[in-house]
């Protein structure tokens, strides 16, 4: 038997930088633009991706400098993960913060960064870049799929 995975034995604050970064499954969901209803505070998801999110790799094109280009980019920290209500239900950070295990398709579990895409979790092929889209038109891009958990592997 191997060692117990770090995400089952460490709190978010105890993780090394590399462990923390590896909790990201590469789905790209957190980089989708969202709308908030001012009256109810309800969050609605759009299929519009951040200008820095690569729609195929589902990774940031300039991760280290992202906040210089996108000032309202949210940097996830253990505190932020516990406070942000809109993190998708499949988010590795959210799952670990809630004391839950990672899904089968998470690269730390599967050993393959492509399983997040094969399971239908990621934004790959389902988004449009925000460049050139007026904020008034965002409602035309509302979607619910970011709240879905994904497909089980075929036997």
From Swiss-Prot:
InterPro entries the UniProt entry points to: Puta_zinc/iron-chelating_dom, UCP006173
Superkingdom, natural source: Bacteria
Matches recorded under Pfam families: CxxCxxCC
Family membership noted in the UniProt record: Belongs to the UPF0260 family.
NCBIfam families per record: PRK05170.1-5, PRK05170.2-5
Name of the protein in its database record: UPF0260 protein R01011
Native source species: Rhizobium meliloti (strain 1021)
């Amino acid at each position: 038997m191997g060692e117990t995975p770090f995400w089952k034995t460490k709190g978010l604050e105890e993780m090394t930088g590399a462990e923390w970064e590896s909790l990201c499954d590469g789905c790209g969901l957190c980089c989708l633009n969202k709308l908030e209803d001012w009256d109810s505070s309800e969050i609605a998801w759009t299929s519009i991706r951040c200008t820095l999110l690569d729609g195929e790799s589902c990774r940031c094109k300039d991760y280290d400098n992202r906040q210089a280009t996108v000032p309202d980019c949210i940097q996830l920290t253990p505190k932020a993960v516990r406070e942000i209500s809109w993190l998708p239900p499949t988010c590795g950070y959210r799952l670990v913060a809630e004391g839950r295990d990672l899904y089968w398709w998470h690269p730390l579990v599967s050993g393959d960064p492509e399983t997040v895409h094969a399971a239908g979790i990621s934004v790959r092929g389902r988004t449009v870049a925000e460049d050139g889209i007026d904020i008034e038109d965002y409602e035309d891009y509302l979607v619910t799929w970011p709240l879905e958990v994904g497909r089980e592997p075929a036997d």
